[in-house]
Amino acid sequence: MALGNALYPLTATVFLCVVGFATSSNENSRFLINSRLEVNVKSLLGEICGTNSSLLSIGVKSLSNEYSDRTVENLCGNETTEVLLWIPVGNFGNLAELGLSSRYLGKGAGDEDFAEYCSYDVTTKSCTTDNGAVEGSILLLAEKFPERYELRDLVYKKWRNSTHLGAPILAYGTLKNREPAYKYVDQDISYLADTRIEYVLPATVTHGIPLSVYRGKTESYKLVAGETYYSRIFKTINAIRYMSPYSTINVTVIGSEGRDYREFRAKLVTVYTDEEGYGWSKSLSSIEAAMIETKLTETHVEYALPVNLYDTQPPVLSPLLPALNEGNSIVDKGQQPAKGIVAKPENIHIHISELDFGQAYPGFRNVAIGAAILFFSVLGVAIIDMIRRTIANRRAKRLHLGKYSRT
């Protein structure tokens, strides 16, 4: 398979995770050029993990800053959920200067089915097997650990569902009090809560990749990168209102949205009654536009477990990283100890825009404003004309002109 054709499945799989992979730095992204994804991990481990294998003591390159290079023996002895890649050795520059490991697992860049695994020496820059040196381009095995991100600092700004001029109407209903001795009405008002969310994800998340959105440690819903999430939930709010006997109150449920689970917190607003003649409540405020801002912050793996690319069973990970070379008698020269998972200092900003629900009548707001301007303009002209006529009549009466003349 050509290198160019291998780039797309590599990218699609590398970024397959709860929210998607985001590059930690520009330096790491250059490693992925002309890389190949190891799709048959079980077969690979079966070939290199034998008891008599001469490859157990050599290293596997890590592409994640939180993970140090580890040996093939450590790779074979621990459950792995990372992505395994074959990367051209030239992408790493001079490995001898890094001083992490003297040898890495490699293979020739020729026919995938017949490529023989070899031991790449960082000093001599040659990859050898029991049968001699491997000619041509060399690929090194590397691990790419998932980077998990969590939505934090959710800030609610505004929300709108325009059925009247700026009034966020969620539902409306009628309360009737048929009891002559009872001045309170207890009634449930139901409404549909629509939610439309469009995620603007980092450019490194491939379009069409399945994503899962978590609220804390609970999966809220699933969507696909590049698509808009939509849901309609039937909700009920309990209304207890003071009402005079035999009266009727029209109520409107207006809403705001909570920070946690995007639930509407509705309140009742009295519109009018047939007895007391209430007008619009002064507490009904106009809510315009819609924008929810949040930050995408990298957090610990246990918040959202990585996707296991080659096993049907979900992975079980401890909160901390497995110690490299733990319990192994063979340790590479210059091997660095493992580091714990830490949150990235940089925050990736994501804007979650609540799409406009649309008005009950398209263009209602503009039409209403235009009609109001026209109405008051005509009213103003009419009032001015009435004043002018009144003044003219008084003047004619005082001067005995027109119909007020003696002749």
From Swiss-Prot:
Expressed in the female midgut epithelium. Disruption phenotype: RNAi-mediated knockdown reduces oocyst formation by 50% following infection with P.berghei but not with P.falciparum. Residues 1-24 form the signal peptide. The chain crosses the membrane at residues 367-387. Residues 388-407 are cytoplasmic. The lineage of its organism: Eukaryota, Metazoa, Ecdysozoa, Arthropoda, Hexapoda. GO terms for cellular component: plasma membrane. It comes from the Eukaryota. (Microbial infection) Acts as a receptor for ENO/enolase from parasites P.berghei and P.falciparum. The interaction is involved in the invasion of the mosquito midgut by P.berghei ookinete, but is dispensable for P.falciparum ookinete invasion. It is a single-pass type I membrane protein. (Microbial infection) Interacts with ENO/enolase from parasites P.berghei and P.falciparum. This is Enolase-binding protein. Keywords: Cell membrane, Glycoprotein, Membrane, Receptor, Signal, Transmembrane, Transmembrane helix. Glycans are attached at residues 52, 78, 161, 250. Residues 25-366 are extracellular. It is found in: Cell membrane.
